[in-house]
Every structure is written in structure tokens, then in C-alpha cells.
């Protein structure tokens, strides 16, 4: 009868940690290098430091993703509880802890929905905490046999918010005779000229105008350049996924009683505005106004932009 062999492996469970950067809106990996993380060992109460030997030997405590949107620690970690802290997000994304969401009442509007509704409020997310033991789900690298524990860390896309204001000179007061009286006075002048008499009292009208909000003006917002999905995703032909082609209509804005119109959740990029309806008693403004939404850094969840139009009265 053959002997039964049992192999016991008493070596401690050690693993390589793989962090995958994801776009929280599309669910796709972010195919950009540069997301940076620190890994805090909550049991030892210290940050993980590891040694790399290429291109030169050095000790690192910040780990960075590659162009495929992930990183693998160069050395193995032991079983413990770890907190993953993002210290830099890739271009076009909000660093973990600085998120904001667009709310309509209690409902969160998806950042992918371009809309004139909602108010932005802080909605920061906690860092990822993972406890790893020998029972933790893991992968085995087919080439090296190394144990790999994978975690996904999503980021919100940075967005823009445009506020457009429209003003123009509008009559607020008429000094002197009423409009009816003015008409009668003009008729009187004509009569005087016919009969050869002068009955003009010398009273005249002074119209007073003030610059104020224009309601009902309509504008169209277009993409000035092609705007791509910030996650770097590609279509079946290998081309970058496009959100808006150059000169695509992105939104239509109509000013309210305060002369304002807002559009939220615009992808970062360059745009231009055209006025299509001037509002009552105003001349259409032919000026095309351009602007670019660019975040100052990865802590800016929303880039705010203001554009003002002024129209001449008819």
C-alpha cells in the first residue's frame, strides 16, 4: 500500500500588495501613471518602507502606479491591517479625501450627467483599510509563484461648473410727461405748424436706464476641442474614448429672473458659448466667448468658471 505523504508549510503568509486605480464613474482602470500611495501598518503604527534596487538602490515609502494604472509593492508584506493613503491622484481625478458631490435634495447626481440642477457639497471618502491573513483571497503570479493580494482604489473625476450672467440696460423711470402726454405734445406740434400757432409747453421726457438682469436669454455651449474620457479608456479600434467631439453641442442655457444660468458636471476641457436668443428688447450679442476648465491641483473637485454677457437694447 503506497505511503501517504503530507506536506506542511509553516512559513508565515507573506504577499505582494497590488493597488489598482479605478475611475469611480466608469469603473474602468485609469490608464495613467502617477497615482501615489503610502501604506500604513495599523498594527505596527508605522508606514511601510521597502527597498528597490533599480535604477538605483533606495528606500521608498511612496508607491506609484504605472501607465496601466496599477502598482505592485517591490517586497512582500506580512499579515496585518493596512490603511492605503493616496497622496497624489492621476491627472483629471480628485485625490481621495477631497471629494464633492452634486446634490439635488438628498439625491446625488452622477458626475457623468451634465445638468443645470443641484448644489455641490463636500462628500469626502475614507482611505481603504484591508486586513490580510492566510485566508484572504489572493492570486498566484504564474511566473514567480508570488502571492498577490489586490485592492481597487476608485477616484472621482474632476468636473467643472459654469455660471453665466446676462445684463443689459433697461428702462426703470420716465421723467417728465407720460408717454401718452408726449404723443399728444408731438401731435400738438404738428397742429401748430399747420395753423401757425405755438402752444408747446416745453415739457420733455427723460428716459432713465439701468443695467440689470436679462431673463430668457438663451445660449449654446460647445466643445472647443475634442474632450476625451479622463480614464484613458480606448474603444475596440484602440482609439481614445471621446466624451465630446470638437464643436459638439454640450448644453443649452437659459437665464432666469436674476439673469443667471448654470451648468454643472462639465468634463474638464475647453468650451465656447454662443448667444441664440437675446431676450426681449435686446440685440443679439455676436461675441463668442471661450474658456478652459483646468484644475489647479488634485484637491480641487470642482472647477468653477464665470462668464458675463452684456447686451445693447434695441
What feature does the model see in each segment?
Residues 1-314:
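Solvent-exposed loop/turn and edge beta-strand elements of beta-rich ligand-binding domains
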Amino acid at each position: 500500500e503506497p505511503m501517504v505523504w503530507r506536506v506542511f508549510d509553516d512559513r508565515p503568509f507573506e504577499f505582494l500588495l497590488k493597488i489598482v486605480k479605478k475611475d469611480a464613474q466608469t469603473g474602468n482602470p485609469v490608464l495613467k501613471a502617477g497615482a501615489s500611495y503610502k501604506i500604513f501598518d495599523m498594527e505596527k503604527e508605522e508606514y511601510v518602507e521597502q527597498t528597490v534596487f533599480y535604477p538605483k538602490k533606495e528606500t521608498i515609502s511612496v508607491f506609484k502606479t504605472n501607465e496601466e494604472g496599477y502598482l505592485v509593492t517591490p517586497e512582500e508584506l506580512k499579515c496585518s491591517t493596512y490603511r492605503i493613503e493616496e497622496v497624489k491622484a492621476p491627472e483629471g481625478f480628485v485625490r481621495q479625501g477631497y471629494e464633492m458631490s452634486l446634490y439635488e435634495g438628498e439625491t446625488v447626481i452622477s458626475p457623468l450627467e451634465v445638468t443645470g440642477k443641484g448644489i455641490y457639497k463636500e462628500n469626502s471618502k475614507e482611505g481603504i483599510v484591508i486586513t490580510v491573513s492566510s485566508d484572504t483571497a489572493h492570486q498566484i503570479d504564474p511566473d514567480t509563484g508570488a502571492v498577490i493580494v489586490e485592492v481597487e482604489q476608485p477616484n472621482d473625476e474632476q468636473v467643472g461648473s459654469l455660471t453665466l450672467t446676462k445684463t443689459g440696460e433697461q428702462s426703470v423711470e420716465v421723467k417728465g410727461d407720460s408717454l401718452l402726454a408726449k404723443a399728444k405734445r408731438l401731435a400738438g406740434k404738428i397742429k401748430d405748424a399747420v395753423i401757425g400757432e405755438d402752444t408747446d409747453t416745453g415739457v420733455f421726457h427723460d428716459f432713465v436706464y439701468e443695467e440689470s438682469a436679462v431673463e430668457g436669454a438663451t445660449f449654446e455651449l460647445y466643445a472647443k476641442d475634442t474632450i476625451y474620457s479622463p480614464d484613458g479608456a480606448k474603444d475596440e479600434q484602440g482609439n481614445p474614448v471621446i466624451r465630446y467631439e470638437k464643436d459638439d453641442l454640450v448644453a443649452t442655457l437659459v437665464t432666469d429672473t436674476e439673469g443667471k444660468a448654470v451648468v454643472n458636471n462639465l468634463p474638464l476641457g475647453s468650451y465656447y458659448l454662443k448667444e441664440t436668443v437675446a431676450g426681449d428688447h435686446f440685440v443679439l450679442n455676436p461675441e463668442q466667448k471661450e474658456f478652459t476648465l483646468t484644475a489647479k491641483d488634485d484637491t480641487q473637485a470642482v472647477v468653477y468658471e464665470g462668464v458675463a454677457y452684456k447686451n445693447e437694447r434695441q
